[in-house]
């Protein structure tokens, strides 16, 4: 999957660890959305 920035990673993409995974169809079962304000399409999810 594509790495994405969770809220817990910090405010900026630069120099931060991207601990989330981007899912176009939303988070799969057992995962949770880790970004409170994100894209209109898809979700940044963590296991």
Swiss-Prot record:
It comes from Anthopleura elegantissima. This is Delta-actitoxin-Ael1b. GO terms for biological process: regulation of signal transduction. Keywords: Cardiotoxin, Disulfide bond, Ion channel impairing toxin, Nematocyst, Neurotoxin, Secreted, Toxin, Voltage-gated sodium channel impairing toxin. It holds the Pfam family Toxin_4. GO terms for molecular function: sodium channel regulator activity; toxin activity. Produces a positive inotropic effect in mammalian heart muscle. Modifies current passing through the fast sodium channel (Nav) in neuroblastoma cells, leading to delayed and incomplete inactivation. Paralyzes the shore crab (C.maenas) by tetanic contractions after intramuscular injection. Transmembrane segments: none annotated. Signal peptide: none annotated. Belongs to the sea anemone sodium channel inhibitory toxin family. Type I subfamily. Its main location: secreted. It comes from the Eukaryota.
């Amino acid at each position: 999957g594509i790495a994405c920035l969770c809220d817990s990673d910090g405010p900026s993409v630069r120099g931060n660890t991207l601990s989330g995974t981007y899912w176009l169809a939303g988070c799969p079962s057992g995962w949770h959305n880790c970004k409170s304000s994100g894209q209109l399409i898809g979700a940044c999810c963590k296991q």
